[in-house]
């Protein structure tokens, strides 16, 4: 994903809100899987990660690349999809992080997988110590569990 051959696409926003006008409010994205577009030509490259998560149904898989900024820029708090799970896989270590409305922060550490209820409001940040901050964001339904008492 850190290769110069990785197809990144410019997005003039980071969250769904188009109200924010800020010089750092953009990112580069690769949608591995989208409910609108289907799988990308390089979808198979993300399969080892999806196999580890083992989702019941995958809704969206996208990689986000945020260029370095002069200071850590915190993005808008948001939720992803309703009533499912979100996993964030951190590609590289940097001083960016994911923050939650509760005040909890999770540092960007390479090969870390963070999983949480998609209804939790969270925000990403940029980094200042590496050229880019790269994560993979996965929204999915987990396999149903049956409990018999």
Spell out what each predicted region is:
Residues 1-56:
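Non-heme Fe(II)/2-oxoglutarate
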Residues 54-64:
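A short coil-to-beta-strand element that immediately follows conserved catalytic motifs
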Residues 57-59, 83-87, 94, 120, ...:
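Residues that flank catalytic or metal-binding motifs in active/ligand-binding sites
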Residues 65-67, 91, 140-142:
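Short beta-strand segments enriched in hydrophobic/aromatic residues
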Residues 68, 106-123:
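Conserved metal-binding segment of the jelly-roll/cupin
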Residues 70-77, 82-84, 90-109:
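A short beta-strand-loop-beta hairpin characteristic of the jelly-roll/cupin
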Residues 76-78, 121-129:
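Short beta-strand His + acidic residue motifs that chelate non-heme Fe in jelly-roll/DSBH
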Residues 87-88, 130-146:
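A short hydrophobic beta-strand segment most commonly corresponding to one strand
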């Amino acid at each position: 994903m850190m290769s110069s051959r990785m197809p990144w696409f410019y997005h003039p926003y980071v969250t769904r809100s188009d109200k924010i006008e800020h010089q750092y409010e953009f990112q580069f994205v690769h949608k591995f899987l989208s409910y609108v577009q289907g799988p990308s030509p390089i979808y198979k490259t993300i399969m080892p990660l999806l196999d580890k998560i083992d989702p019941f149904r995958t809704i969206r898989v996208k990689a986000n690349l945020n260029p370095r900024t002069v200071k850590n820029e915190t993005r808008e708090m948001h939720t992803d999809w309703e009533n499912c799970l979100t996993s964030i896989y951190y590609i590289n270590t940097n001083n960016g992080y994911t923050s939650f409305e509760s005040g909890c922060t999770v540092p960007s550490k390479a090969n870390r997988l963070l999983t949480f209820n998609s209804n939790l409001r969270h925000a990403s940040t940029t980094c200042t110590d590496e050229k880019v901050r790269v994560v993979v964001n996965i929204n999915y339904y987990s396999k149903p569990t049956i409990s018999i008492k």
